[in-house]
Structures are given as C-alpha cells and as structure tokens.
Amino acid sequence: MSTGPMPAGNEPQAAVPAAPFGQPVPGSVPVAAPVAAAGTAAMAALPTPSGGIPMPMTVAPQIPGVPVLPAQARPGISADPEWFRTAVFYEALLRSFADSDGDGIGDLRGLISRLDYLAWLGVDCVWIPPFYPSPIRDGGYDISDYTAIDPRYGTMEDFRELVHQAHQRGIRIVIDMVVNHTSDAHPWFQASRSDPEGPYGDFYVWADDDSGYDDARIIFVDTEESNWAYDVERGQFYWHRFFSHQPDLNYRNPAVIEAIHDVIRFWARTGVDGFRLDAIPYLTESEGTNCENLPGTHEIIAGIREMLDREFPGTITLAEANQWPDDVVEYFGTEEAPECTMCFHFPVMPRIFYALRQGSAEAIRWVLEKTPDIPAHGQWGTFLRNHDELTLEMVTDAERDQMYAWYAPEERMRANIGIRRRLAPLLDASRSEVELAYALLLSLPGSPCLYYGDEIGMGENIWLEDRDAVRTPMQWDDSPNMGFSTVVDPGALTLPLIQAPGYAHLTVATEMGRPDSLLHFTRRILHLRRSHPVLGRGGFLLRPTSDDAVLAHTRCDDPSAPEGESLLCVANLSATPRSVTIEVPELAGRRTIDLFGGCPFPSIDEHGRLTLTLGARGYYWLSVDRDTPESVENAEGTEHSGDSQSSAPPADTTSTHTAQNRPTERMPDAHRFHLRSQGSTERGVDRAPAAQRPGPVDLAQRHRDPGGPGPVDASAPLVPAQRRRRPGAGLLAHHRLLGTRGGRARPRHSRTAGRQRAR
C-alpha cells in the first residue's frame, strides 16, 4: 500500500475528448501506484499503530479554484432535485464493461468511451460497483483501501474525467459504498489484529469465543458455517456476516462512524451524484436478535444522510437491504429524520419471474399489496437482474422449489439461496416474455435499474464460480474478444467470454444494425418511459380485473397538476390470449390511446369498465383522455428533459442504421430470438407483406413484424410481442440461441435436454 502523496491529485488535467460511439477515448491509461489510504480526522492525531502501517489523512482531489458544486447544480445536469424519480439506472460492472488499454480488464476510460452509447440507450444514471483496491475475492466488495482506485481500473484523474464526461451527457454517477465490512487485507484490520490495544484495535467486532449472536442467520450458506472466524494472530474470533475474509466493522466505536463519514466525503468531493449503501441491515449487533435492521443501524444511516444533506446537498443514497418491504421502508426514515433517498424493492423481483411461469398475476399483486406506503421524499428502486444471484430468500419453500424447477433445474445454476443466471436465458429466450418483463419493470412503482448486457440479451457462463456466471465481458461487436478488449491472450481477460453457437450475433453492433432487435426495443421503451414522467412520479393503484392472469394498474399525477396525466397499464402473464374487463370507476367515459401504437382504443364506459383483448404475454400502456398521443417511435428521439444536451444517436450510427439507408437482411436461422418476426411461427416463416397484416386496432392480433425480407418501415409503431409460443418447441436458454435450424421446429424435449454449455 502506497504511503506517498496522491499522484497528481490536485493538478489540473486536460479534458479527455468525447469519442464517437464505439471508439476508445484517445490516449492510453498509465498504471499508477494506488493513492494513499484513507484515514479519518479522529485517527489522524493518533499514533501509528504497531506493525508499521502508517495511515495518513487524504484529501479528495479537486481542480484548483473550482469549488465542489451541489449535486443539483452541475453543468449538463438538470437542477431538478427529484431527478431520481424518473431516472433509469444502469449497472455497469467496470471490470467487465470495456477495456481501454488492452490488458483484458475493463476500466474507467473504457466506460468513458461508451458513455455515448449509454446516452443513446436512454440511461440517466450509471451505478458503478466497487472499483477500489481489493483482493477480488468477492467481486471487489472486499475492499482493502476505501480512498484509492485499483490501478487495474485507472487513476483518480480518470475517475474525475468520467464524472465530468458523464455529466456533459446528462448522465449521473452513483458508486457503491460498502459500509458493513472490509477485506481482511485492509490496513485497518491488519492493525486491529496485530495491536488489540492500538487505535484500530476496536475497529472490528472481536470476541473470545464464537457463541455470541447465535440468532443471526448465515447469509452465504454454500460456503460459510458460522458468522465467526478465528484469527490466529490476535487469538480471538471476529464477526463477519458475509465471507470470512470480510470482517464486519464495529459501529459501536465512534471512530469507525467518523472514518466512514470521511470516506463518503472523499468521494462526494469528486462530484458523484450518489452512493449505493451496500448491505446496510447488518451494521450493528445485539444479543437476542437476528442482528438485522436494529435501531442503531438506522441511527448510523440517518447520520450519513444528515452529513450529506449538510455538506453535499442533492447527493442521493440508495439502500441495498435485501429484506421484506415492512423492514426496508424503515430505511427511508421520516420526513423529520430522513435516511435513504431510495431503497431497492427485492421481493417484487422474484415474483415477476414466478408470475411469468405460473401464468397468473397473483404473485405480483400480492407483494404489491403487502408493500407499505413510503415517505414523500423516498422512491423504490426496482430491477430484474443484477450482479448477484436472483435471490429466493423471500419466497416460500414451495415457491422456491418451484422456481428452481422452472429456472434452475441444474444444480450449477444455483448459488446460495438463489439463481445465478441472466435475464434472457432465464426466460428461455422468449422475446415476448422479455418484453413483458421490461414493460412490468418500467411501469411498476419505483425507478428501474438495468444490468449491463441485458439490453442485448446476453447469456451466462454457469461453469464459472459463484456469481461470476453473470459477470462476463460485455459483447460489443464481432471482433476478437467481442470488442471488449484488444488483449491478444484470451486467458488475460477478466473472465472468459461466452462460447456458444451463434454467440457472435449477441452484440451491440449487430443489434444496433437491426431496428427490430431487442436493443432497439429496449431503447424505445426507455425513451417512452422518459416521455411520460408519471411512470416515475405518479401515484400507483392496482385495479380489479376479471381474469387473474391479467395485472392492471394506474399511474396518475395529482389531479390538480396543470399538465398531469393518467396511464392505465395492463399485462397478461398467461401464455394464452385473454379478454379482460378492468374497473377504473373514477375514469368513466374517458378515451384511451395506446402509447406503443399511438392508436385510439375503446373508451372506458360509463360504469368505469374497460374491456380489452390481450395476446399471450401481451401488454398495453394506455394514456387516458390525452389529446395528443405519442408513439414509441416519436418518443425515441425525445430530448433528455434537461439532463442531456442531445439524445441523437452516436455519430457512427446515424447514417447506416436507418431503414431508409439499409435494406433488411434475412435473419440467420441461429439467431431468431432477436431478429425473428414477432408474428412468425416456430418454423421461422417470414412475415406476410404489410398489406396482409392485421390493422393496428385489431387488439388481439396486432404485431409489428419486421423479420422477413424487404425494407423495414421505421415509422411503423412498435407493438408488444403477442405471439403464442408453441409448447415444447425451441425452449433452450438464450445464449444457446432459441430458434429454428434448417426451417424445422425442434421436437418436444425436457427443459434440461440437450443443453449446450458455455465453456
């Protein structure tokens, strides 16, 4: 660990020029020594602990003469303090996203080079998991230095440039702050174990035996047998809620609280817009409890929020608390004593997947009804997948067994109490199911977070250890290493690329060139959500339906709002078409317009009922009594509502990927998931000519069907997929490319038969 000055930490740096989409930022990234480790104001005056580990106080880097601006007053960023309500978050795993210097490891400048792509996609905020120095025994969540950047990822100048370049594009930056534990390689722990009476001796939870807190559950049941681990050097046990190499900090020690405050101050001075507070339910311990969500923990989080509001106003905090909503809601705090700005809603996620296989909306409806109201200052965070396993901790034993049978029939698909698979393979590469999942994610209460690669339908490598199965390199194009890195030796890559038949088609470049791809669908639905802020700010109310397979809810602005809007969102979780009547009595007599197709739908009758027919896995977003309908295609070019200077496509894609300039190629048989017609059969029959297709107001049969030969009409509205999949045909995981071979449907087979494994 370096004890010297931070390299060039306070020197003005030349701005990195914005690179066109898909091109690396000019200049190489020098590998610098890590900056000095963080101390604290309280610790700085204390003597150096025995063992020769000096820990000087460091100061966050700043450009001389340029003050740190409040989060709501930064160039390129809107001044709206409520920006997070309508934002789309995107988790970019740094080491697997983009490599700028050819060493096989993703880095900060690689992320900078892809900011134009993220702005084009419709991302408002990038969440970056840990990039600090670490032994990388838990994906970087085992931190050995809180105030440095792992030299494999770049330098502090690179990070500051990332924040600047992101803000110039209207994109905010949220970083992970692991406040519960450190790595056992952290100097604090090394000092604590070697000098129990020294200034760091009480930084962790030590005991003479392992009998304490025996009501606390073990989180990583696959690898850990106890929450205590014995340290030979100190001759005592230390407490850890996660891996044994991640000792928990002792928040009963005021110096620990001040040290963590200083770490957060350090990064807030770089201009980041928020912090995801990792694993916060476990900060304190108490005998006779399960050591989760204790009052002392809430005091600690409230203290962090108070410090940020006072010193860095507008900076948000996002709680990662894998708990039931009744417990999580406490992390919002109160209006008088706020805690977190946002909290992830964990239980709704597995129930979306459960509902898709059960063919009923009851599981989703149940968890939403169990979700308590939250304070006015708060907002839920929602997601379908992330860098961890799809947790099944908050489903019943019977539901868990059923989900394992549906989604993880092979043992190696599982991790801890969950499933280590990506979105598209989970859903058997069904375009209609993936679309429906996104339609639910983007219309339910909360701000959605996408996981890198899910927008193109990336697969997983279940042969990798633990959760690395879903952390493989981003697939940008069909060049060597999928455009992720220029390194010659594939063994130098941070993780192996997915190797499966047809995998080269699952790239940003391929899907960018096809207007009917999953990537373009994702972009359009994100921009549609952006053009209707009610989906982020509006009230939410479940609506009674005549069919349990159909979920209906409204998102409504305050009726007194001069430009308020009301949306009715309807989703059919069944694999068969359904006709349903929805009750919305206060909207009786109002007209409805389909936001995806831009066409009028039936008006709600005088009794407040609306009857619709939905195709299999079909969905609608209906604007109620709006004068000017907007289609997805119009929404795609929507301005960034003040948070972006332009939403135009990146320079290298504007002239080559329009329907007018590019004839539609016949899609490869091996890749019909992304490119096949939504109205085609499993035999891969191309679409009928436009004149033979049903009209846009045919509610049961409407399709956009651009998979066959001939030009694609880019002005045609994008319509949700409603094709009924024939049972038993082509049910292979996504990275093995569902589809047809030689124009013939595959025979019926079990869900596990003939699996091609990524190696």
Protein language model annotation of sequence segments:
Residues 2-13, 18-29, 33-645, 660:
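Active-site and adjacent substrate-binding regions of carbohydrate-active enzymes
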Residues 3-7, 44, 580, 594-759:
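Regulatory N- and C-terminal appendages and interdomain linkers associated
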